[in-house]
Amino acid sequence: MPTIQQLVRKGRQDKVSKNKTPALKGSPQRRGVCTRVYTTTPKKPNSALRKVARVRLSSGVEVTAYIPGVGHNLQEHSIVLVRGGRVKDLPGVRYKIIRGTLDTQGVKNRKQARSRYGAKKEKS
C-alpha cells in the first residue's frame, strides 16, 4: 500500500488492455481478398472440418478468418468483409467473415438467426 506522498510523486499506473483484433486497426470491419480457402480440425475434445480462409485485409495484414454457417461459395480472390470475433476451438482464428456481403452469399434455407448469416426472409 503506497503512502499519499508516494502517490503524489508517482501516481497510479493505468492498466493497459490488450487489443483482441489488431488487424482491423480500430475499424468495426475491414474488406479483404481471400488468398486461400481450406478446412482445419479443431482442438480436443471437438472433431469437425471447420471452414476457414486466409484473407489479406485492406490494412495490409493477412489473417485467418472463420466462415460461419452451412456451405459457402468462397474461393481464392473472393472479396469478403471481415469482423472481429474468435472461434474458441480453432487456435489463431480471431476473425469471422460476414455472410451476405460483397462476394459472400448468405446461408440457404436459414429460418432462425437470419441476420447473422445474411439470409433473406422467405416468401410464404
UniProtKB/Swiss-Prot annotation:
Gene3D superfamilies named among the record's database cross-references: Nucleic acid-binding proteins
Keyword rRNA-binding among UniProt keywords: yes
Pfam families: Ribosom_S12_S23
Modified residues (3-methylthioaspartic acid): D89
Keyword Protease (UniProt): no
InterPro entries: NA-bd_OB-fold, Ribosomal_uS12, Ribosomal_uS12_bac
SUPFAM superfamilies, per database record: Nucleic acid-binding proteins
PROSITE patterns linked to this entry: RIBOSOMAL_S12
GO terms under cellular component: small ribosomal subunit
One example GO MF annotation: structural constituent of ribosome
Entry's Gene Ontology BP terms: translation
Region (Disordered): 1-32
Domain of life according to the entry: Bacteria
Keywords: Methylation, Ribonucleoprotein, Ribosomal protein, RNA-binding, rRNA-binding, tRNA-binding
HAMAP family associated with the record: Ribosomal_uS12_B
Function statement: With S4 and S5 plays an important role in translational accuracy.
Oligomer and partners: Part of the 30S ribosomal subunit. Contacts proteins S8 and S17. May interact with IF1 in the 30S initiation complex.
Family: Belongs to the universal ribosomal protein uS12 family.
The protein, known as: Small ribosomal subunit protein uS12
Species the sequence originates in: Nocardioides sp. (strain ATCC BAA-499 / JS614)
